[in-house]
């Protein structure tokens, strides 16, 4: 199973293809088996706060990703899907869009205040934030 914050869910038993219908069926099954409202199940499972996907227009995607890496020299850096910078108590991933001149940022931290603080450090490194 794999998933994205953008709402895409991939299932091995569906040839690793995205399937909203399978995701919906899995959620319905979990709610039925658990007996609690979905809102309670989600609250109990949520451990981190997420930024959601934020888009940035950039002239040079690779250079912007390298600025991010350089700004956090103590971070663990992964380059599996774009660049992930992991500082233990928070992390972010920036990956280039394959269809638009955009970088897509996702950031996760312990709470909304930390997400906001880290976004204010990361965003200026990437380019111009856009709403699409």
Placement of each model-derived feature along the sequence:
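Phosphate-binding and adjacent anionic-ligand microenvironments
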Residues: 1-132
């Amino acid at each position: 199973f794999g998933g994205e914050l953008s709402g895409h869910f991939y299932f091995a038993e569906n040839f690793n293809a995205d399937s909203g219908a399978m995701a919906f069926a899995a959620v319905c099954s979990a709610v039925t088996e658990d007996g609690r409202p979905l809102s309670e199940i989600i609250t109990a499972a949520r451990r981190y706060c997420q930024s959601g996907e934020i888009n940035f227009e950039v002239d040079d995607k690779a250079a912007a990703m390298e600025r991010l890496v350089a700004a956090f020299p103590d971070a663990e850096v992964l380059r599996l899907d774009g660049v992930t910078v992991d500082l233990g108590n928070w992390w972010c991933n920036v990956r280039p869009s394959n269809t638009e001149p955009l970088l897509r940022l996702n950031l996760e931290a312990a709470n909304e205040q930390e997400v906001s603080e880290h976004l204010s450090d990361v965003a200026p490194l990437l380019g111009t934030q856009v709403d699409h």
